[in-house]
Regions:
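Feature captures the catalytic cores and cofactor-binding loops of soluble hydro-lyases/lyases
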Residues: 2-19, 24-136, 142
Length: 143
């Protein structure tokens, strides 16, 4: 796999910091408690398109959170277990996802000038500079 020159997205910082890695993208919201296995970072929600896929060490790109207020607790446990995503990029800001981002202590951005769910694809290399609110996307080139 090789990558093409980067696309820049600009947004709003939720949690500062910098991270880069492979993107894991879903257009479906993620349920925290009961929707993920926080010890492995695997999505266990039966009908979710990423069922059985782990977000561990990925840049998680998703619309936002669904479910109970225990969402943040699930992501806190994932961080403690070493199974958390490296960074989060999301489109819908709620108190659940904001608190989840804070307890995760990983860079997080929202309110981007382009829709990250259409610009970023699973497997793209993504660099998140949440301090500046910048996301750089290096498109995966299929050879």
């Amino acid at each position: 796999m090789s990558v093409a020159p980067g696309v820049i997205l600009r947004g709003r910082t939720v949690v500062g910091g910098c991270a880069e890695g492979e993107a894991l993208v879903t257009r479906e919201t993620i349920s925290g408690w009961g929707g993920i296995d926080p010890t492995t970072g695997t999505i266990i929600e039966t009908r979710h398109p990423l069922h059985g896929v782990s977000f561990k060490n990925k840049i998680l790109v998703f619309p936002g959170a669904k479910g109970s207020s225990a969402w943040s607790a699930a992501f806190h446990v994932a961080r403690l277990a070493g199974a958390a995503p490296k960074a989060m990029i999301f489109t819908v800001m709620t108190t659940k996802v904001a608190l989840g981002a804070v307890v995760l202590r990983a860079p997080a951005v929202t309110d981007l000038d382009q829709d990250p769910l259409t610009v970023i694809e699973t497997g793209d290399w993504v660099r998140v500079d949440a301090d500046l609110g910048i996301v750089e996307v290096f498109k995966r080139v299929k050879i």
